Amino acid sequence: MPIIIGISGGSGSGKSRFARRVQSAFPEESTVIEQDWYYRDLSGINLEQAKKTNFDHPNAVEHTLLHHHLNCLNQGIEVEAPDYSYINYRRLLSGNILFPSPLIILEGLFVLCWPEIRNLLHFKLYINVDSETRLERRLKRDTK
């Protein structure tokens, strides 16, 4: 059974960066899963409606698929992680195969929100950064 670490925090708090740093310490023994890959596919609604979606709400994420993928990895079964296009609000097949590994690092805004996912986590981290710093980071990141 792998060790699963959940990393949460506000947008721009450094979740992804921290997850990648942990992974770099164990490159052959770890897998990173990004919650952002699991945003709901909105291809069934018009683009103007999709643009109004609040992605900073747990309902924007298909957490049942994320939970299923975590369970598969927990059982030693590889999965194909989705990807998400913020241009057309669609989930894409990424070809990104996640292999079972001794360490699974799950990062995202809401990974501590859902009990069924939270109960799979061996370690739960919340990165607390002041809102001004997070906003600066988010603007820098999102306007590249």
Q: What are these model-predicted stretches?
A:
Residues 4-6:
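Short hydrophobic/aromatic beta-strand immediately N-terminal to the Walker A/P-loop
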Residues 10:
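P-loop (Walker A) phosphate-binding loop of NTP-binding proteins
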Residues 15:
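Conserved lysine of the Walker
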Residues 18, 22:
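Hydrophobic positions on the alpha1 helix immediately C-terminal to the Walker A/P-loop
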Residues 25, 39-40:
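Internal catalytic or translocation cores that form aromatic/hydrophobic pockets or channels
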Residues 31-34, 40-88, 103:
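Conserved nucleotide-sensing/catalytic segment adjacent to the nucleotide-binding pocket
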Residues 92-143:
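ATP-dependent NMP and nucleoside kinases share a basic, alpha-helical "lid"
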